[in-house]
A protein has these predicted regions:
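Short beta-strand/loop motif that positions the catalytic acidic residue
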Residues: 254, 260-262, 266
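N-terminal cap/lid segment of alpha/beta-hydrolase-fold proteins
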Residues: 3-58
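Alpha/beta-hydrolase active-site loop
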Residues: 109-130
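Catalytic histidine-centered segment of alpha/beta-hydrolase-like enzymes
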Residues: 297-308
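Primarily recognizes the serine-hydrolase "nucleophile elbow" in alpha/beta-hydrolase
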Residues: 132-194
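The serine-hydrolase catalytic nucleophile loop
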Residues: 72-84, 272-273
Length: 335
C-alpha cells in the first residue's frame, strides 16, 4: 500500500477467505434506493445515469461518488454496478453514469474520448444540483484515465478525491502491446498510416469510416478476437497523438488524494505501470497516493470483484473520515 506516510511500498492484499453469495434482490437492496436520471451535456447530448443511495443513515449526506465505466462498458454492468450498489449499502451515495464512450460509441463514431470531459462535467453538475457538495471521482479502466484528466484540467471545487481501478499508464501503449502480442491485422503502425491517409491529417467527420481490426484481442481470425473502431474514435483514444488517453500526463497534476487499486495479475496493465503512476503523481505534487494490488485478479477482477470493491470502500471511508475531522476542527476554530 502506498500512502502519504509510506510512499514506495506496494502491498499485495491477500484477505482471509470469506463466504460470499450473489445479491438477493428484495433483501440486500432493501436499505438502498435508486433514481434513474438523464444527464445533459453542454454540446447537446444526454446520457443515462443512476443514483444509488442509502435509504437511511448516510455516512455523509453531502458526499457522493461518481462512477465512470471502462471501454465498451456502461453505467449498469460489471464493475460500475457493483461499486455503486455496495457503496450505497455502506452508506455512500453513488452516481454511476454513461458517457459517449459507453457501449458502442467507438464503433459508430460518437465515442471521442477528448469530448468525454463534457459528459463527466454534466454528471458533476447533476450531483451539485442535487445538493452534493463533496464528490469523489471513481473510474474503472479507461474511466480511470477519463476522471484523472477531468480533475487535472478542471479542478472542480467539489471534488475531494480520485479513486481509480485497473488504471492504465497509457491507453495507446496498452493497446499497441496487445496488438503486437497477437499479431493484429492491421498492425499498430499500419493503422496509423491508414488513418492518416484516409483522414488527410484532418478531423473531418465526413471522412470517418468504420474499420475492423482482426487478431486484436486474441490469436485467431474469429469475430470474438476482432475490434471495431472508426478512424476518429481510434485516433483520439489509441493513436500516437491521443493526449487525453495518457494518464501518465495527468496524474502529476492532481491536487486531491489519489487511489490506485490495481489487479496484481492484469495481462493488460503490468504491475510496474501502477507503481510508475504512483511515482508520477507524487513527484508532480499529488498530496496523497494510495497504491494497492489485488492478489490473483485479472483486468476485470474475475472472482475478485468484491476484493476490489472492498478496497475501494475502505479508501473512500478513510478519506471521508479525514474530511469530517478537518471540518470539525474548522468549526471549532470558527466557533
Amino acid at each position: 500500500m502506498t500512502t502519504h506516510r509510506d510512499a514506495f511500498h506496494p502491498r499485495l492484499t491477500n484477505p482471509a477467505p470469506i463466504v460470499r453469495r450473489p445479491p438477493s434482490f428484495g433483501k440486500d437492496d432493501a436499505h438502498i434506493e435508486t433514481d434513474l436520471i438523464v444527464i445533459p451535456t453542454e454540446d447537446g447530448h444526454s446520457w443515462d445515469g443512476m443514483i444509488f443511495r442509502p435509504r437511511h443513515g448516510a455516512v455523509d449526506p453531502r458526499l457522493a461518488v461518481l462512477v465512470i465505466h471502462g471501454s465498451v462498458g456502461n453505467y449498469l454492468t460489471g464493475m460500475p454496478r457493483r461499486l455503486a450498489f455496495h457503496l450505497a449499502q455502506e452508506g455512500y451515495a453513488a452516481l454511476t453514469a454513461n458517457t459517449r464512450m459507453a457501449n458502442y460509441g467507438v464503433f459508430f463514431g460518437t465515442g471521442l474520448i477528448d469530448r468525454a470531459q463534457l459528459d463527466i462535467a454534466g454528471a458533476v453538475r447533476a450531483l451539485r444540483e442535487r445538493g452534493f457538495g463533496r464528490i469523489i471521482l471513481l473510474g474503472y479502466s479507461m474511466g480511470s484515465t477519463m476522471v484523472s484528466q477531468y480533475q487535472a484540467v478542471h479542478e472542480p471545487p467539489e471534488v475531494v478525491g480520485v479513486c481509480t481501478i485497473a488504471h492504465p499508464l497509457s491507453l495507446p501503449q496498452s493497446l499497441r502491446r496487445r496488438w503486437e502480442r497477437f499479431g493484429s491485422i492491421p498492425s499498430y503502425n499500419e493503422m496509423c498510416t491508414i488513418i492518416s491517409r484516409q483522414m488527410e491529417g484532418g478531423d473531418d467527420p465526413e471522412r470517418d469510416r468504420i474499420i475492423i481490426v482482426r487478431r486484436a484481442t486474441g490469436p485467431t481470425e474469429h469475430p470474438e478476437d476482432a475490434e471495431i473502431w472508426t478512424y476518429r474514435t481510434w485516433w483520439k483514444s489509441r493513436g500516437p497523438e491521443a493526449l487525453s488517453a495518457e494518464s501518465r500526463r495527468w496524474v502529476g497534476l492532481l491536487r486531491v488524494p489519489l487511489a490506485l487499486i490495481q489487479a496484481a495479475d492484469d495481462p493488460l496493465i503490468p504491475q510496474p505501470e501502477g507503481a510508475l503512476l504512483a511515482t508520477l503523481a507524487q513527484e508532480g505534487g499529488c498530496p496523497e497516493v494510495h497504491l494497492e494490488y489485488i492478489e490473483g485478479a485479472n483486468h476485470t477482477f474475475d472472482g475478485h470483484e468484491l476484493d476490489a470493491v472492498d478496497a475501494t470502500i475502505q479508501w473512500v471511508t478513510d478519506l471521508a473520515r479525514r474530511a469530517r475531522a478537518v471540518r470539525r476542527r474548522l468549526r471549532i476554530r470558527i466557533g
